[in-house]
């Protein structure tokens, strides 16, 4: 872990020097380890060169725009990282399942999202998307652990339990999302996250590898 963080720190300097923007999006099951993976990434980055964007329900201003507007406005400056803790994929998951958008809207979203990500990549941006995959039993164990730990109780909400009750519906939506929006320019990386340590290593390795490859291809 430390060696990978050291390498990422070196690469961050190179990314800054070469003015390459980097977008990392994290999605996954509730309690899937998004926050822990993001924390291990940011420990390796210069605080002046990254922003973490936690994504929740849109506010009134955001609702008055196209649903992708708030993500466009959070794009990183050249040489910087933006890390999204949840992302624009809410459209084809929670909004689809909870009925916050129409069937036409979420079906149209796959192409809209692919076009947005392609335009980022075409402008010289590295785009990676991580799906943190845990099984239902591991999620139940983590929920219970959070409920019983006073320091972690804030992490578990009624909404988490409601989402869990719709696991099968979410599974269908997730599978369709991964199939329809994993591209060469903005791939999905499925992170087997039942082991938190393994997940954090895989995320770091993937980011390091993607930046190294980009630098080789764009000498």
Model-derived features with residue positions:
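Glycine-rich phosphate-binding loop of ATP-dependent small-molecule kinases
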Residues: 1-219
């Amino acid at each position: 872990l430390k060696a990978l963080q050291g390498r990422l720190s070196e690469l961050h300097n190179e990314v800054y020097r070469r003015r390459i923007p980097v977008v990392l999006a994290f999605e996954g099951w509730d309690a899937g380890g998004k926050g822990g993976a993001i924390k291990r990434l940011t420990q390796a980055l210069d605080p002046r060169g990254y922003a973490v964007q936690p994504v929740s329900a849109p506010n009134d201003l955001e609702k008055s725009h196209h649903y992708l507007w708030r993500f466009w406005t959070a794009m990183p400056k050249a040489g910087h990282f933006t890390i999204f803790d949840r992302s624009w994929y809410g459209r084809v998951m929670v909004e689809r399942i909870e009925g916050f958008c129409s069937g036409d809207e979420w079906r149209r979203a796959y192409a809209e999202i692919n076009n947005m990500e392609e335009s980022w990549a075409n402008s010289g941006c590295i785009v990676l998307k991580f799906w943190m995959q845990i099984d239902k039993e591991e999620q139940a164990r983590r929920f219970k652990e959070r409920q019983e730990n006073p320091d972690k109780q804030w992490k578990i909400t009624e909404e988490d339990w409601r989402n869990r009750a719709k696991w099968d519906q979410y599974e269908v939506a997730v599978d369709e999302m991964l199939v329809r929006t994993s591209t060469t320019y903005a791939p999905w990386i499925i992170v087997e996250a039942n082991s938190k340590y393994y997940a954090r290593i895989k995320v770091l390795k993937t980011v390091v590898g993607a930046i190294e490859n980009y630098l080789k291809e764009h000498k």
